[in-house]
Amino acid sequence: MNQIKELIMKLSHVFLSLLLTSGLNLAYATTLAATNTAAPQATAADYKPVQGQAGKDVIWIPTPEGLIDKMLSTAKVSSQDKVFDLGAGDGIIAITAARKYGAQSVGIEFNPDMAQFARRKVAEAGVADKVKIITGDIFQEDFSSATVVTLYLMPQLNLKLRPILLNMKPGTRVVSHAFNMGDWEPDERIADQHARAYFWVVPAQIEGAWVVSGLDGGPMRLNLSQSYQQIGGTLSRGGQSFAL
């Protein structure tokens, strides 16, 4: 009988300990939940980008304002242009193109918080009538209406964009901060202190065989080869051929 009483007492102590422990844990969890509920929650209006932060296949580093001016002036941006900035970040290139050069501008930015931040900057700059910020993927959005394309991406993204850019309307101007387009040689290199950029004009595709008729002495035949903006080939007329 005594052994049974001792066993009951031990079980009672164990049960009481478990109950007290559970009560403490419950109280702690309740307090923690209350604390978390009381903590202020960050909103989209509080978002501020941090230099070097990771994005989709890129990191965000703002383009220096001095280089932005040189990029846009090299591209001869005017009020007649529509500028698309691919990977718009804080929107500064699109804003500058509108505010200083009078262009209509569109920025495409993948990060929704960054895109909203750029929209606030657009409003603060007073150019909401000229600048639109799109939340989207540069490989999904249509920017074929651009007369000028600006970008600050990564080398592999430039190469992925290259065939898209080359299929744009001949004469479209392209300016890239920091990175080139592989073996598509730039028409001009831009430097500003420690920063650099590259400028291209999308060439017309004229490779192939051409015949020019209506000339004295008979037709002239052109067989043209093309590598980006570099043109070669032969000119044939009257049984003679000349290298171009």
Regions found by a protein language model. Give the residues of each.
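A short SAM/SAH-binding and catalytic strip from SAM-dependent methyltransferases
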Residues: 143-160, 166
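Conserved class I S-adenosyl-L-methionine
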Residues: 79-89
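Glycine-rich SAM-binding Motif I of class I
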Residues: 91-95
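C-terminal substrate-binding/active-site "lid" region of AdoMet-derived donor-dependent transferases
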Residues: 158-207
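Conserved SAM-binding motif I beta-strand of class I
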Residues: 104-109
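Central antiparallel beta-sheet cores of small beta-barrel/beta-sandwich binding domains
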Residues: 206-244
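S-adenosyl-L-methionine
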Residues: 30-80, 115-145
